[in-house]
């Protein structure tokens, strides 16, 4: 239903569930890519599933300028093992959010599956180098 101020109004006890196309995680796996002329920041929920006992969910924020990006993980939980590291870089005016297998881990999680949801926030100011 249409909500106030251009929002979407949901009925009580209505939620979203995500089971999108998953991405296998290997070295330098690009999870998402966006142009900084369109968006300046994004809020991610990343769900990682390796097997029945190794699962992880990560909440992170990304903000980017013309030649730099900053990523902050503000929430993370798992069943005992960190599975991935998350980073963001700017390359030719595009932000890439990248997953790598956890560098400090004692297990090999090669091929873990990632699913994500994201809210993008539009760039307001013109890009000036």
For the regions a protein language model found, what residue spans apply to each?
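Short, flexible beta-strand-to-coil junctions
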Residues: 45-65, 101-104
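Terminal beta-strand-rich extracellular "head" domains
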Residues: 61-85
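Hydrophobic residues positioned within well-ordered beta-strands of beta-sheet architectures
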Residues: 42-44, 97
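Low-complexity intrinsically disordered segments
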Residues: 77-129
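Parallel beta-helix/beta-solenoid repeats that form elongated, surface-exposed shafts/blades used
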Residues: 1, 57-60, 84-87
């Amino acid at each position: 239903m249409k909500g106030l101020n251009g929002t979407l109004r949901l009925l009580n006890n209505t939620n979203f569930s995500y089971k999108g196309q998953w991405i296998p995680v290997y070295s330098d796996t690009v999870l998402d890519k966006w142009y900084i002329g369109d968006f300046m920041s994004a809020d991610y929920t990343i769900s990682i599933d390796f097997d029945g006992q190794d699962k992880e969910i990560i909440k992170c924020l990304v903000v980017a300028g013309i030649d730099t990006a900053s990523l902050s993980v503000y929430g993370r939980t798992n069943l005992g093992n960190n599975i991935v590291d998350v980073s963001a870089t700017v390359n030719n005016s595009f932000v890439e959010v990248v997953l790598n297998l956890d560098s400090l881990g004692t297990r090999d999680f090669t091929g873990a599956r990632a699913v994500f949801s994201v809210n993008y926030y539009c760039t307001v100011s013109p890009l000036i180098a």
